[in-house]
């Protein structure tokens, strides 16, 4: 009997970031349209990131954005990718995302991470040097608040005394917890304390290959042999008639986004040897993003699935300044011309 083909899921990463001076009310309506279209086209998940004080970009707040999506959609999973957990207190976060899980009827994926921008830590009055401790303590408290009637514990800057989460989560025991991580120690931490690590879009494929081995060893050490049931990779994807057109079409938008990443200091938390997002566009995209025709992009995804055991592929297709029609055209092409080829080819 032939082995069953692995299941593969496809998600959409919508950063919800736009240039200064853009028509933000109009863009918000377009993002809601993109979410509804993603569900109609059969995408499995819609992911929204989180940053604060995002000059030179506008960025919609993650919690309010996902809350709105609970009403705009009915089936697609809603991924918080990621909550900057050290900036917050556990009761606040537990209650916010319990509400989202309840309002969506159990469609939340709770993604967390440390963050890397000094402006955010300073704005929230949090010392960056204690971020790892805060992440772990906050996550422990949130899990307990989601699963216990009363919680008594202390953490950095907060104290719970018979505290509870005012709204119950729908998923049992709680929504999936994913950790976004760039550096090797953070990946090892994800293996230890999260349900899954979701692979960032910034690193070259050779770096990703090495870090997946780091993750596997850390899972083994944590008593969790093998990859998680849902192993998610994020990649920037641009599909067009051919690779040259995709390369040209995406250039002004990806350049603007990665220039902002570089200025924000995203590079500083990436591994040595692959920690410069200020490269020229031609060098930046090489062996990092997926560009090409539907056939070419399908082949690239199939290769990543087969090499790394990925079974949930989240695609970044919306970048600051990109016209709405360009985003929806690409979504349509992915759903109609890429997803079937990938499912047939794996």
Residue ranges of each PLM-predicted region?
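Conserved, mostly hydrophobic/aromatic
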Residues: 38, 42, 69, 100, ...
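Flexible, glycine-rich active-site loops centered on histidine and acidic residues
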Residues: 5-26, 86-157, 197-209, 213
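Alpha-helix-loop-beta-strand connector modules within alpha/beta enzyme cores
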Residues: 59-80, 134-138, 331-346
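Acidic (Asp/Glu)-rich catalytic clusters
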Residues: 2-5, 39-40, 66-74, 97-108, ...
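An alpha-helical appendage that flanks or caps ligand/catalytic pockets
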Residues: 2-6, 12, 130-165, 204-311, ...
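Hydrophobic faces of well-ordered beta-strands that scaffold small-molecule active sites
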Residues: 10-14, 46-48, 78-80, 108-112, ...
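Glycine-rich, proline-tolerant flexible connector loops at the mouths of alpha/beta enzymes
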Residues: 45-69, 84, 201-205, 316-327
């Amino acid at each position: 009997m032939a082995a069953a083909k692995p299941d593969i899921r496809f998600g959409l990463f919508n950063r919800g970031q736009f240039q200064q001076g853009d028509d933000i009310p109009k863009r918000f309506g377009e993002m809601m349209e993109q979410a509804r279209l993603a569900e109609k086209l059969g995408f499995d998940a819609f992911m929204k990131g989180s940053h604060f004080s995002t000059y030179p970009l506008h960025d919609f707040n993650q919690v309010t954005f996902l809350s709105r999506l609970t009403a705009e959609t009915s089936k697609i999973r809603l991924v918080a990718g990621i909550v900057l957990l050290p900036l917050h207190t556990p009761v606040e976060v537990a209650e916010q995302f319990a509400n989202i899980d309840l309002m969506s009827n159990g469609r939340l994926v709770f993604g967390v991470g440390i963050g890397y921008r000094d402006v955010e830590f300073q704005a929230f009055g949090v010392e960056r040097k204690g971020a790892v401790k805060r992440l772990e303590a906050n996550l422990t408290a949130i899990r307990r608040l989601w699963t216990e009637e009363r919680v008594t514990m202390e953490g950095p800057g907060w104290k719970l005394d018979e505290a509870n989460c005012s709204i119950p989560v729908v998923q049992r025991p709680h929504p999936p917890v994913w950790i976004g991580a760039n550096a090797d120690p953070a990946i090892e931490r994800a293996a230890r304390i999260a349900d899954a690590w979701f692979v960032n879009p910034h690193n070259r494929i050779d770096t990703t290959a090495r870090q997946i081995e780091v993750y596997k060893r850390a899972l083994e050490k944590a008593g969790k042999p093998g990859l998680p049931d849902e192993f998610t990779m994020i990649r920037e994807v641009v599909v067009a008639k051919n690779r040259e057109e995709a390369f040209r079409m995406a250039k002004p938008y990806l350049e603007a986004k990665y220039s902002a990443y570089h200025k924000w200091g995203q590079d500083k938390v990436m591994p040595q040897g692959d920690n410069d997002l200020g490269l020229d566009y031609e060098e930046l995209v090489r062996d990092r993003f997926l560009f090409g025709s539907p056939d070419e992009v399908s082949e690239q995804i199939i290769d990543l699935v087969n090499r790394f055991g990925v079974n949930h592929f989240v695609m970044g297709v919306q970048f600051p300044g990109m016209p709405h029609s360009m985003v929806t055209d690409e979504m349509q092409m992915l759903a109609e011309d890429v997803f079937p080829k990938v499912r047939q080819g794996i």
